[in-house]
């Protein structure tokens, strides 16, 4: 009985694998081999560039809207109160 169940499961797995491997997916506008006809791509591009879009493109990018970053080196940090706390054992430049 165990042998028949094992053969049945193997046969079912074989059918599932063959079904997936032998079938070919055909999408609208696609030819066998994954190629598309040029006319349909051109029509799709024309449809996308209708000219009367509802979405507006923002004038500034998000990076331009951020405040600028000020990099502070040791010379600029002379009066900065945390300089002594960050480098307590520093004696100077060598």
UniProtKB/Swiss-Prot annotation:
Signal sequence coordinates: 1-23
Which cysteine-cysteine pairs are annotated as disulfide bonds in the entry?
Answer: none
Return the GO cellular component terms, semicolon-separated.
extracellular space
| UniProt-listed InterPro entries | GnRH, Gonadoliberin
PROSITE patterns in the record: GNRH
Report keywords, A-Z.
Amidation, Cleavage on pair of basic residues, Hormone, Pyrrolidone carboxylic acid, Secreted, Signal
Q: Which GO terms describe its molecular function?
A: gonadotropin hormone-releasing hormone activity; gonadotropin-releasing hormone receptor binding
Residues annotated as carrying Pyrrolidone carboxylic acid in the record are 24
Q: Where in the cell is it found?
A: Secreted
Q: Organism's domain of life? A: Eukaryota
Q: Which residues carry this modification: Glycine amide?
A: 33
Provide the family line.
Belongs to the GnRH family.
Q: What does this protein do?
A: Stimulates the secretion of gonadotropins.
Q: What is this protein called?
A: Progonadoliberin-3
> Which species is this UniProt entry from?
Rutilus rutilus
């Amino acid at each position: 009985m165990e042998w028949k169940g094992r053969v049945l499961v193997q046969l079912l797995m074989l059918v599932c694998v063959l079904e997936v491997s032998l079938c070919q997916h055909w999408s609208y506008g696609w030819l066998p081999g994954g190629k598309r006809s040029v006319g349909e791509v051109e029509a799709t591009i024309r449809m996308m560039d209708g000219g009367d879009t509802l979405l507006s493109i923002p004038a500034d990018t998000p990076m331009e809207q951020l405040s600028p970053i000020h990099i502070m080196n040791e010379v600029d940090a002379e009066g900065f109160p945390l300089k002594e706390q960050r480098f307590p054992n520093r004696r100077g430049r060598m």
